[in-house]
C-alpha cells in the first residue's frame, strides 16, 4: 500500500537590503520550507518485493494465422478459479518462492522536507573588488530511512563489552526472512556552511574570482543505494543498531573547498567573440567506496546482532587502565624468517593506546563513542 498523496506547500521569503548605497553594500537573506522526495526506487521495492506471490500470464496460440487483437488477450482474472479455467494459461513447473526481503512502506510515510535559511553580505571594496560572505543553515524534517522488522530490541537484552560500554542486543524473530520498512526519522539532521568570495572584473576582458567554503552536515543516512538493502547498510554505522536511527556526519559534504576561476574574453569582427577560462578546485572530498573523505572506527564484527556487517561504532577507552577490562589475547604468528612470534595481549593494549594518542580525533573522544564518519 502506497502512502496518500496530499497537497504540499513550500513557502519561502527573502529580502535584499541596500545598506551602503547603490552597488556598495547589500545585505540579503532568505528562509523557506521545501518539500523534497525520497528515492522512488525504494517505493518501487514496496511493489515488486511486496511479499505476495506474483505470476505472469502468457497467452499462447500456436495455430493463429495473425496476431490476436489486444482485446482478445487483455483479460484480467481477479480470482484463482478464473485464472485456472483459462485454456491459454501457462503455469511454471516450479512455483516461485516468496521474496526473502519484502519491503514494507510506512502507511504514514511523509516526503522529505528541509527548512533552509541563508544570510549574506555583498560589499564593494577598493579597486572595484567584490567581496561576499554567506552563511547557510538547513534542518531536515522527516528524512526517509530504512529499518528492519525481524531484528528488534526487546527493551531488556543488552551486551556489555566493557564496564563503560553496554549496548542494546537485538533479537531476530526469523533469520530466513528480512522485511525492510521505509519510514521517517527525527528532526536532528542538519547542514551548515560559510563561504567567503572575492571577484574582480577588468576592463580589458579578464575576470577572476576566488572562494572558500567550510561546511559540515549530519544525517541519519546518506540516502544512497538503488535497493533498500543497501540503503539500510551503506554509511549507517551506529552505537546500538541501525534501527535506532542515529545521526552521524554525512559523507556527501566537502568539509573544505577552494574554488579559483579566471577567464578572458575578446570580441572581434563586430559579431564574434572568444572566451578562454581556467578553473581550479581543491577539496578534501571524495565519495567512493574505496576513497571516501570520511571513515568510521568500528568493530571488525557485529556486536549487537542487527545484521552481519561491521557497522558498530567503537568505544574509545578513557585510559590505558580501562583496556585491562577489554578482551585481548595473545596472537601467535610466523614471521618472514619462518620463526614463530607471539604478539602478547599487553603489547596489543599498549599499541592500541598509543594509536589513540597519536590520532587527534580519537584522542578527543576518550571515554566516548566514535562518531559515524
PLM regions with names:
Residues 1, 99-105, 175-183, 239-246, ...:
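Extracytoplasmic loops and strand-loop junctions of Gram-negative outer membrane beta-barrel proteins
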Residues 1-184, 303-314:
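Solvent-exposed loop/turn elements at secondary-structure boundaries
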Residues 7-9, 113-115, 190-192, 254-258, ...:
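Residues that define the transmembrane beta-barrel architecture of outer-membrane proteins
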Residues 39-41, 221-222, 289-291:
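A short acidic (Asp/Glu
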Residues 47-49, 152-153, 229-230, 293-297:
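Juxtamembrane/interface motifs at transmembrane-helix termini
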Residues 87-91, 275-373:
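Extracytoplasmic gating/loop element in the C-terminal half of outer-membrane beta-barrel translocons
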Residues 132-273, 277-286:
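Gram-negative outer-membrane beta-barrel transporters
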